[in-house]
A protein has these predicted regions:
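Metal-coordinating catalytic core of metallo-dependent amide/deamination hydrolases
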Residues: 125-265
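C-terminal cap of metal-dependent C-N hydrolases
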Residues: 374-425, 430-439
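Active-site gating loops and adjacent loop-to-helix segments of metal-dependent hydrolytic enzymes
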Residues: 62-96, 121-130, 157-177, 234-259, ...
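Histidine-centered catalytic micro-motifs
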Residues: 49-61, 225-232
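N-terminal metal-binding scaffold of metallo-dependent hydrolase/deaminase domains
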Residues: 1-36, 46-47
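His/Asp/Glu-enriched, well-ordered alpha-helical/loop segment
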Residues: 254-257, 261, 303-383
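Acidic, glycine-enriched loop/beta-strand segments at the rims
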Residues: 8-17, 295-297, 302, 359-397, ...
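Alpha-helical scaffold segments that flank or form the walls of functional sites
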Residues: 65-147, 178-193, 439-450
Length: 455
């Protein structure tokens, strides 16, 4: 399959008349610039590397537009999140994830890292198929054609030194060894198709002890990407210091987790010493600007982290907003508000965080529309009410998800003008507007909750 692009925008460089050829493995075989279109080329307009959503909780999408009436903070919002989690079984989980992944796809995300901890029944018992919830996510990704890195998460405690609460029992595996046993079994059970890969996550230092973090790190293959929530709230820092005399970053470093494969999610409340340690380790930091704003988390030290050597990526997290352009803009907006300066991250750096940064944090390799890279790309409308007149290299600060036209994953068009083209899997998603899938999934979850309440 070959695509002739009117222009590509990579690392802030605009290149005209580019042919990108994808091989049967879905990777780029050839890139040639300054060439005329051939009859067998698929013609695209302005193309950018697809965005890699480095942090998502798909089921949190159920809360969009439903948690703003009572004010509160992150901890109050978490109560609503637990209630949403309690409604899900494998069938509903697949339906919700399929709808959310479809929304991501048409909005310009070509890959997603799903930070997944809904492993078991609500009472903590395993399903008859022990990987039912994980396979639901894998099937959902294949249903729509998005690239998925399943970040299977270890979650063992309800707080430092505290047991899981009853509403958290679905998250736990009893011990770090028990989680590792299930993780390796899942690795063997996931079909190998190039679209879905397995990663790992530690929920947080609140949910996994220092000793268990060490066990997890030692028990995982060294190539597997490892993610962890870090310092999203000041309370987490206070609890970590009270228990260990260390910040969460310090705990991770002491447990052997801090290094180039680690992706720290949020990092909103890091000390100068934390920033230096993360940068020196060459770790990834996944900022989630729209979620951090929605939950009132604060503004993280993104520029200082990047200057220290950390690699910045972006994620939609709770999916209150699904728009990679707004995440890019939010990263820069936070820095401007905190510093009083413009241009803390230039457009090329913002696009790099959304694209190459996300793919690197997810262990997906280089992502620069180069030979050997995944052929994952998005076409952007440059003549819309938002983008008309914009310099192509500055699209990260003018476009939105509404400007995404065609989306290509693994060398195949999977979305066009906000509509799924179809992954060729026989699930009937071709021609579907993701809004239809979302309405259906939300209605199914709401109906299930209503039936429970009436019993």
């Amino acid at each position: 399959m070959s695509y002739w692009c009117e222009a590509t925008v990579v690392d802030g460089i605009v290149t005209r008349a580019v042919r990108i050829t994808a091989g049967v493995d879905g990777r780029i075989d050839d890139v040639t610039a300054g060439v005329p279109r051939r009859d067998d080329d698929i013609a695209l307009g302005v193309v950018m590397p697809g965005a890699g959503n480095a942090h998502s909780h798909a089921f949190h999408r159920l809360l969009r537009g439903r948690t703003h009436g009572a004010g509160g903070d992150f901890w109050l919002w978490r109560e609503a999140m637990y209630a949403a989690a309690s409604r899900l079984d494998p069938a509903l989980y697949r339906e919700v994830a399929r709808a959310v992944f479809a929304e991501m796809l048409v909005c310009g995300y070509t890959a997603v890292g799903e930070f997944h901890y809904l492993h078991h029944r609500h009472d903590g018992a395993a399903y008859a198929e022990p990987h039912a919830m994980e396979l639901a996510l894998a099937h959902a990704a294949r249903d729509v054609g998005i690239r998925l890195v399943l970040l299977d998460t270890v979650y063992l405690a309800g707080g430092i030194g505290a047991p899981l609460e009853p509403r958290q029992r679905a998250f736990g595996d009893g011990s770090a060894v028990g989680w590792l046993r299930r993780w390796h079994a899942l690795d063997a059970a996931l079909p190998v198709d190039g679209l879905v890969t397995l990663g790992a996550a530690i929920h947080s230092v609140r949910a996994v002890s220092r000793g268990d973090i060490r066990t997890v790190v030692d028990g995982l293959p060294p190539h597997v990407p490892l993610h962890v929530h870090v310092s999203e709230q000041p309370r987490e820092n206070a609890e970590s210091f009270a228990a260990y005399g260390l910040s969460p970053v310090g705990v991770l470093a002491e447990a052997g987790a801090l290094g180039p494969r680690l992706a720290l999610v949020h990092g909103t409340h890091l000390s100068d010493a934390d920033v230096a340690a993360v940068g020196a380790a060459g770790a990834h930091v996944v900022m989630c600007p729209t979620t951090e704003a929605d939950l009132g988390d604060g503004i993280g030290p993104a520029r200082r982290l990047a200057d220290a050597g950390a690699r910045i990526a972006l994620g939609s997290d709770q999916n209150a907003v699904v728009d990679p352009f707004l995440e890019m803009r939010g990263l820069e907006a936070g820095e401007r508000l905190a510093s009083g300066r413009r241009g803390c991250f230039d457009p090329a750096a913002l696009a790099g965080a959304a694209g190459a940064g996300g793919y690197a944090a997810l262990g997906l390799g280089s992502h620069a529309l180069a030979v050997g890279d995944h052929c994952d790309l998005v076409e952007v409308d440059t003549a819309s009410i938002r983008t008309a007149g914009s310099a192509l290299a500055q699209l990260p600060l003018s476009a939105t998800a509404a400007d995404v036209r065609r989306v290509v994953v693994a060398g195949r068009v999977v979305a066009d003008g906000g509509i799924l083209v179809g992954a060729g899997d026989g699930t009937g998603t071709a021609g579907t507007d993701p809004a239809t899938l979302l309405r259906s999934a939300i209605a199914a979850v709401d109906g299930d909750a209503a039936r429970e309440e009436s019993r």
